Amino acid sequence: LYPIGENGGSQKLLIQAAKKGRIRVEMSRRICQDCGKESPNLICHNRNSEGEVVECGGKTIERKSRGSNSRRRRGERTTVDLDKLLEVKRRLLGLDRLPEFIKAQKELLSEAQTPEPIEKGILRGKFGVSVFRDGTSRYDMIDVPVTHFKPKEVHTSWKKLYELGYEKDVFGKELENDEQILELFPQDIIPSLNAEEHLIATCNFVDDLLVRFYKMEPFYNVKTVHDIVGSLAIGLAPHTSGGVLCRIIGWTAASAGYAHPLFHAAKRRNCDGDEDSILMLMDGLLNFSKHILP
């Protein structure tokens, strides 16, 4: 979620815009509390000298606009040395080269017009992850209500389900095989296997973001969809602003998302076959921001 104006072509590609060197775009005007220089970012990107890779890293505060107070958006026309900025970010992230396909925006639609850290876009491009306008990566599925299931139907072993709290079947017998019928917990979900590629890529992106940008340990360590079982996610209807916490317990071959009627109703008041989305919880915690919403 970084503005490049008309410089990125019809696909709004960051690398294509960077070939022009300097670009002029509308972004927030902020002042670093450490070095006193202007930076459009929440964390100052300025360097002491051109040859250095280390950035200031100080927190910035919004500067009073020089324009009219009647404008809905508070950004101002700013010159960005995009090619130099991307090269510095590449070196800071420890990448050999930048991904070719990094999508950007023509303009920022939020009130303050504060951009996301450009590093997030670079790492999304590395894993081919799309981004919604709130900073998260979502996968849409049709809602299908389900109340009971068998372990073999959700591609999860009964032993794994036992670890997740499914200790007894509907008849009160101890869970000990894949043929027993279990009652679905209200906040457990069974997404479509069609989401496999997207969710694995999102988990890998989040781990890379934690390691390269936040300098922390990876969280998901995912290689297959079975590694995602037990992970927390957020269910969200497109017309509401409140997500509902859920847990992934298995997968379905259907092109739909199976979940308890109470879960679907919590998202949108009913469960009559509408389409909602899920996003990984850590993605939401790291990347969602009300400040970048239109």
Give a label for each model feature.
Residues 1-294:
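Conserved core architecture of multi-subunit DNA-directed RNA polymerases
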